[in-house]
């Protein structure tokens, strides 16, 4: 003695479950087809911005070329000399990096990181 409404309820639920993915796919297609706002950036602004960046890069490259160290001044595998009382090392966590060599009679203090 089931009522006709109880028989229709499972059928309506199954139909709804079958239609939900189709509705979601349609909504997703509409979202994908919407054009993006690319007209915010005009071609003129991009060209002028690129020119500015290129000019700045060329200036930096010119400065780097002028600061080259002559080959006879390069000392591979050596660090420069520093004065007494000057910072001779850098601490990064548990590691200590050497910045320069201390002069004779002094050594790099591992606590103060200075030539003492």
Curated annotation (Swiss-Prot):
GO cellular component: extracellular space; secretory granule; synapse
Modified sites of kind Phosphoserine: 48
Organism for this UniProt entry: Bos taurus
Compartments, record wording: Secreted
GO terms of molecular function: neuropeptide hormone activity
Alphabetized InterPro entries for the sequence: CART, CART_C_sf
Listed CDD domains: CART_CTD-like (cd22741)
Domain of life according to the entry: Eukaryota
Gene name linked to the record: CARTPT
Role this protein plays: Satiety factor closely associated with the actions of leptin and neuropeptide y; this anorectic peptide inhibits both normal and starvation-induced feeding and completely blocks the feeding response induced by neuropeptide Y and regulated by leptin in the hypothalamus.
Family the UniProt entry places it in: Belongs to the CART family.
Record GO biological process: adult feeding behavior; cellular response to starvation; chemical synaptic transmission; circadian regulation of gene expression; G protein-coupled receptor signaling pathway; intracellular glucose homeostasis; negative regulation of appetite; negative regulation of bone resorption
Annotated S-S bridges: 82-100, 88-108, 102-115
Secreted as UniProt keyword: yes
Coiled-coil residues: none
Alphabetical keyword list: Cleavage on pair of basic residues, Disulfide bond, Neuropeptide, Neurotransmitter, Obesity, Phosphoprotein, Secreted, Signal
Name listed for the protein in its UniProt record: Cocaine- and amphetamine-regulated transcript protein
Modified residues (Phosphotyrosine): 41
A Pfam family matched in the record: CART
């Amino acid at each position: 003695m089931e009522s006709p409404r109880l028989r229709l309820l499972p059928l309506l639920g199954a139909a709804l479950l079958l239609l939900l993915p189709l509705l979601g796919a349609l909504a997703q297609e509409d979202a994908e087809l919407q054009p993006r706002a690319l007209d915010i950036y005009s071609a003129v602004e991009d060209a002028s911005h690129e020119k500015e960046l290129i000019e700045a890069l060329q200036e930096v490259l010119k400065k780097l070329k002028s600061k080259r160290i002559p080959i006879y001044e390069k000392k591979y595998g050596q660090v420069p000399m520093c004065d007494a009382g000057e910072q001779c090392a850098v601490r990064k966590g548990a590691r200590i990096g050497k910045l320069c060599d201390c002069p004779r009679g002094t050594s790099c203090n591992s606590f103060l990181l200075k030539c003492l």
